[in-house]
Amino acid sequence: MTDHIRPLIAGNWKMNGLKASTAEFEAMLAGAAEVTGKADLLVCPPATLLAGFADKARGTRAVAVGAQDCHAKASGAHTGDLSAEMLADAGASAIIVGHSERRADHGESDVVVHQKTEAVWRAGLVAIVCVGETQQQRDAGQTLDILRGQLNLSLPQGSTAANLTVAYEPVWAIGTGLTPTAKDVEQIHAFIRTLLIERFNGEGARMRILYGGSVKPSNAAELMAVANVNGALVGGASLKAADFLAIAKGC
């Protein structure tokens, strides 16, 4: 882990969670004091739970609440979509954009991710921009080229350490139980760091780079010890307070 960058453990609940799941979030709030010296915590529930979670967290500063996606426009005739401004109004402090499941399920391009990132900033929030390669791209030896292209096109020129976090999520590792080796993660995060510094200079040196892809309590400490890994984007393991907090303790 890069020592001067405070780590972030971000939980992406994806399309999981009903009102009864508030109990898990309350348990996270209750246990957060044990890890606040190690990392910042962020939970991104489905939009139906966002405002309720934000109300629970208000005044504690123990766990921040975020969103999983937004529309690029501030308002308009976009049935079923939510703007960054709406999510900010509901209590979000950050929004995930460009997750591989959005790219795959909804055909979101790097250009769309770029537009959504700017929308997140327009609402005064932090953008967590996801990049990563598929198994086919990995097998073809295209990982670095794919990441370079995604970063160049997805990240707007105004990116700073304060308004942007990058999340590397190898698509082949998401929800599969598979994870790259610590050496692989180190090489890829070093590559991402180099690209960020080349483009954004000192800001790029201070940006958080999260690792995402089957992060769980049993492998968190090893992954978080890797250079240029400044936290994690956690999927399934973030649904349980005990697992989520255990991952944060690995920082």
Curated annotation (Swiss-Prot):
Substrate binds at N12, W13, K14, G175, S214, G235, G236. InterPro entries: Aldolase_TIM, TIM_sf, TrioseP_Isoase_bac/euk, Triosephosphate_isomerase, Triosephosphate_isomerase_AS. It is found in: Cytoplasm. GO terms for molecular function: triose-phosphate isomerase activity. CDD domains: TIM. Its EC number is 5.3.1.1. Keywords: Cytoplasm, Gluconeogenesis, Glycolysis, Isomerase. One of its GO terms (biological process) is glycerol catabolic process. The active site is at H99, E169. It is an enzyme of class 5 (isomerase). Its main location: cytoplasm. Belongs to the triosephosphate isomerase family. Involved in the gluconeogenesis. Catalyzes stereospecifically the conversion of dihydroxyacetone phosphate (DHAP) to D-glyceraldehyde-3-phosphate (G3P). This is Triosephosphate isomerase. It comes from Bradyrhizobium sp. (strain BTAi1 / ATCC BAA-1182). The lineage of its organism: Bacteria, Pseudomonadati, Pseudomonadota, Alphaproteobacteria, Hyphomicrobiales.
